[in-house]
């Protein structure tokens, strides 16, 4: 019973951290990385598919992505999809390769992005604390029903708190790393 509650809490906290990682990867930092285009879909044989399924996306240099379509006729469609993606990118076609230069971020935009990142991190922390609250509530219910002793409840709550601390520390590390990345010029 206690193990089930702890495993569930661990799984849900890990999910909150994964969600934060996913959200942070979408934010543009001014440095090229392939995950920047993960959310971009292109029409490929009548279906909307992620750009990765129609082209090879690679980092050419710190400010440029290279998109190489698997099929030559996909170049205009991929170019159009990147422009329509609301990422503020302007792809340049060079034969079979589409180069996507990343404009540098202004100081105001960097600060706004840091604010966004801090907000995302706080939401992840709140989600982790909510999982802790739910787990502790479940433990209290077990103790009230005399299914576990008070000592077992206290030990389990301490274990849940250690889990919470570990995942909140991961969130803080992700936040710090992303802030540093954003403020780099």
Curated annotation (Swiss-Prot):
Subcellular location: Cytoplasm
UniProt-listed Gene3D superfamilies: 3.30.1360.40, Ribosome-recycling factor
Entry GO CC: cytosol
Record protein name field: Ribosome-recycling factor
Family: Belongs to the RRF family.
Any one GO BP annotation for this protein: cytoplasmic translational termination
Keyword tags: Cytoplasm, Protein biosynthesis
Keyword Transmembrane: no
Pfam family, any one: RRF
Entry GO MF terms: ribosomal large subunit binding
InterPro entries the record matches: Ribosome_recyc_fac, Ribosome_recyc_fac_dom, RRF_sf
Task performed by this protein: Responsible for the release of ribosomes from messenger RNA at the termination of protein biosynthesis. May increase the efficiency of translation by recycling ribosomes from one round of translation to another.
CDD domains assigned: RRF (cd00520)
Major subcellular site: cytoplasm
Top-level lineage group: Bacteria
Record bears the keyword Flavoprotein: no
